[in-house]
């Protein structure tokens, strides 16, 4: 047992003088590992008389615990010292000025949508929303566009199957509102729509705002006055507005709406292709068939509808010449609108 006491003293001395955690691990292996000094002493128990083995075994276990406790204590001490040294070296000077954070802002398309909603909210319109995954009936059939109608070729549609699709306009929201609500109805329907098209002025996903008013005694004059007032409020200018005859299956009569070019004030430029006019939206009186399919009597009620692309209006308002810039996530571009 004198050898055991000597081994313990030797191990404790080595632990006390160690200044490195890695060296501490080597000491542990040397004394307590599978081939360590104290482990080898334990293996000599078989050479002792049976009556002495329990007593000697207990002494060896006490010795091993003493060495292990010393190793643990020294390791904790060394790790604490290392942490303190690192904290001292990495101390933060709280008197240094902080780094500024870039502030974000609303996306120009979001700004445009909010502005459109505000313009119509002031004159009594409510905001209505609907599903982006739509069925064929609400996207086409209920809007006077049956399966054989050539107007379907105007919509490059993303289909999931024969009946379900990504909506190509927000007009289905108008249909769903007319199905669930009796006149008078005054709504605007902002939202994402999808068409298989992509170039400088088209995107496969874009934002559209459509409006609907249904009541008694509604005329094209009401539609004309509403649109003229909206466009002047949106652009904050006294713009010239003109209506050109057009065709939409769900309105009759129908019209395209042009405004005096906001870039050249009607003098002619590259943006308006030297015409002095810019097309901004479509409109018309709600077709009687559309009213009937929503169980509204066209003999008693009339309505008008209009639709516009939010990106198109944003391009004109902010002077952007490429629609795709709105979706490139380029902070250099978006930072101009904070």
Swiss-Prot record:
User: Which coarse location class applies to the principal site listed for this UniProt protein?
Assistant: cytoplasm
Note accompanying the cofactor annotation: Binds 2 magnesium ions per tetramer.
What processes in GO biological process is this protein linked to? phenylalanyl-tRNA aminoacylation
Enzyme Commission code(s) on record = 6.1.1.20
A molecular function annotated in GO for this UniProt entry is:
ATP binding
Q: Which organism is it from?
A: Pseudomonas aeruginosa (strain UCBPP-PA14)
Please name the top-level EC class of this enzyme: ligase
Name recorded for this polypeptide: Phenylalanine--tRNA ligase alpha subunit
Among the Pfam families in the record, one is Phe_tRNA-synt_N
Question: Any idea which positions bind Mg(2+)?
Answer: 252
Q: Where in the cell is it found?
A: Cytoplasm
Instruction: Name the needed cofactors.
Output: Mg(2+)
**HAMAP family, alphabetized:** Phe_tRNA_synth_alpha1
What cellular component terms from Gene Ontology apply here? cytoplasm
Give a yes or no for keyword ATP-binding in this entry. Answer: yes
Q: What is the catalytic activity of this protein? A: tRNA(Phe) + L-phenylalanine + ATP = L-phenylalanyl-tRNA(Phe) + AMP + diphosphate + H(+)
This protein's record includes keyword Translocase: no
Q: Which residues form the signal peptide?
A: none
For this UniProt record, give its keywords in alphabetical order, as a comma-separated list: Aminoacyl-tRNA synthetase, ATP-binding, Cytoplasm, Ligase, Magnesium, Metal-binding, Nucleotide-binding, Protein biosynthesis
């Amino acid at each position: 047992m004198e050898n055991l006491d000597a081994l313990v003293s030797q191990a404790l001395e080595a632990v006390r003088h160690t200044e490195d955690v890695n060296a501490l691990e080597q000491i542990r292996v040397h004394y307590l590992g599978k081939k360590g000094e104290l482990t080898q002493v334990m293996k000599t128990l078989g050479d002792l008389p049976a009556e002495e083995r329990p007593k000697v075994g207990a002494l060896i276990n006490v010795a091993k615990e003493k060495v292990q406790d010393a190793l643990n204590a020294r390791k904790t001490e060394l790790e604490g010292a290392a942490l303190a040294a690192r904290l001292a070296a990495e101390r933060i000077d709280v008197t240094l000025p902080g780094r500024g954070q870039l502030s974000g802002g609303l996306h120009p398309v979001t700004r445009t949508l909010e502005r459109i909603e505000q313009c119509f909210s002031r004159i009594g319109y409510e905001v209505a929303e609907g599903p982006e995954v739509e069925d064929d009936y609400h996207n086409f059939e209920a809007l006077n566009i049956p399966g054989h109608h050539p107007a379907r070729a105007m919509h490059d549609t993303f289909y999931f199957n024969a009946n379900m699709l990504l909506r190509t306009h927000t007009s289905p929201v108008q249909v769903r509102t007319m199905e669930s609500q009796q006149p008078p109805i005054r709504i605007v329907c902002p939202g994402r729509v999808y068409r298989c098209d992509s170039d400088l002025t088209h995107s496969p996903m874009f934002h559209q705002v459509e409006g609907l008013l249904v009541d008694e005694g509604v005329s094209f004059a009401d539609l004309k006055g509403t649109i003229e007032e909206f466009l002047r409020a949106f652009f904050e200018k006294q713009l010239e507005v003109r209506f050109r005859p057009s065709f939409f299956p769900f309105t009759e009569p129908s019209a395209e709406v042009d405004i005096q070019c906001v870039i050249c004030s009607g003098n002619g430029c590259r943006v308006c292709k030297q015409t002095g006019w810019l097309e901004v939206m479509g409109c018309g009186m709600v077709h009687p068939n559309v009213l009937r399919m929503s169980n509204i009597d066209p003999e008693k009620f009339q309505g008008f509808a209009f639709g516009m692309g939010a990106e198109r209006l944003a391009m004109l308002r902010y002077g952007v010449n490429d629609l795709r810039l709105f979706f490139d996530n380029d902070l250099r571009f978006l930072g101009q609108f904070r």
